[in-house]
């Protein structure tokens, strides 16, 4: 079952057909930072997308060399020097029905500009709890409604982002970033099994600490651990590392 790359054709913007599984939420994406017209950590994004696609049964038949070539071609075509590129993989067109499967997945690349935010982040706690057993939280799926609602709530009360907790009241992640805290010169971050997306920057930071014999632990964290921490920060592929200023104004 192949993967079809939908490319620009003249002035026409590539799009998914109305019968595509993506309109039922069956799709994945990767957001890749572009520096000096080069995609950052392209292999890690390709690898994660492939692993996630296999979990969902979405065909992802594209080699890393082809993936990288498509990224470069799109970046060059859009004259992007600094910015981002989004790769969206859909389940493909299929017959009507929740359990139906597309036979040919579809992949679109979109470039965009963005600004790096340098100010510290003000967080709020979201008042509903996540089920850590829900497999969706470990996938970068196109189903972002929960994050949209949460971030709008945060902005409405003057915060920057929202922090989720699971049904055991353990910290998970924000709407778009992984969380770390520092306590007694030890770096801590929530476990993937607590219901988080295994972020690319998160993985790089953990690997960097391990390579340089710096103490880093993946454990379940409570809100009090955040409040008592020496420092708290967030990571994601576009913004890098951002310090957390407060959680619920504390």
Where are these regions (language model features)?
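Helix-start/capping segments and mature chain N-termini
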Residues: 1-73, 90, 98-250
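Short secondary-structure junctions
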Residues: 76-83, 214
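Ordered, amphipathic secondary-structure segments that act as subunit-interaction surfaces
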Residues: 80-91, 96
